Amino acid sequence: MNVHEFQAKSLFAQFGVPVPRGKEITSPDAATAWANELNTPVFVVKAQIHAGGRGKAGGVKITKDKAAVAGLAKELIGKTLVTHQTGPKGRQVHRLLIEEGANIAKELYLSLLVDRDTGWPTFIASTEGGMEIEEVAAHTPEKIIKEAIDPAVGFQGYNGRNVAFALGLQSLEPAVINPFVKMLGNLYRLFMEKNAALVEINPLIITKEKTLIALDGKVSFDDNGLFKHEDVQKMRDLNEEEPLEIEAVANNLNYVKLDGNIGCMVNGAGLAMATMDVIKLAGSEPANFLDVGGGATKETVAAGFRILLKDPNVKGIFINIFGGIVRCERIAHGVIEAAKEVKISVPLVVRLQGTNAEEGRKLLAESGLKLDVANDLWEAAQKIVKLTGNAA
């Protein structure tokens, strides 16, 4: 689960990480009132959406004129921002973060996540703050610093000093080394206590006054840990989430919307990814990732159909099932019953392999439904691509 920047900074402040004075704003009148209260030489007005690249898209405004803040708020609230992370439709701005500016001497990058290779929480740092860290890693990987934290021991002072000296803080600004080490310890505490998946500050700045400030912030949470954190659950903004993904969660389905036109319904995440790959190899693009799981029932299959067909981009559906935990004839019954409940107006190809696959294929063949049954994965992918008119 993602949260807005103002929410991330609120968490930072709770855990002793320095942030600019700022406030969530939802109207020009509130912007005027807060600007008068903030009374700072520089005002920063930032659109709040769950996507990066806001600055390049015109979603961050800076002014020294207190009277101009309300006008900037009016300009941004309701605006649709299109960034490299939003897709072509963009995201509408419903709220802002208005905060004080800062005297920047140096920008750094800092994040904390779980390293998939080691399974340990790992700090990622760089002197190239304010840039896309993926670009830094691709073009100048030597500027990426990693410090793994043994979860059995937890964060230790030497971990923070390792990062500080690798960044060259002893040369840049020795006065911030101790506050930096303390801040890393606080970020680690936030990460562990709140079951975060990512904590990111980009940029973390050293000010001309020789202090540290988290100028931008991002926190993502592990969905599996949300039940333990009611305060985090309350931060959820459904306006920022894909409606079909919300519906899928309500039906215990793992669904991610994509940009293609072939809807996929698969059991198992690995098979789902392989299915998307083979659709692309056959000359088309998947419209989604949809994993119905090992306990697929008539109800979950029907819910999956409803979700797929609500996507106007879907021109065909490919059901790819390997019967291990779930038997293929059960899936076949689910498809047949779901097709009666949900009008399927696009081509449908079903591939069943594994436990009771023959029985499942027979049921589908005798159902009278307008569908194609395939035995081979490549054959099935070619069929659905051809039926949707997108053969390579």
Regions found by a protein language model. Name each.
Residues 336-337:
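Short amphipathic alpha-helix used as the core "switch/output" element in two-component signaling
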Residues 345-354:
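Short internal beta-strands
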Residues 324:
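Catalytic core of bacterial c-di-GMP phosphodiesterases, primarily the EAL and HD-GYP domains
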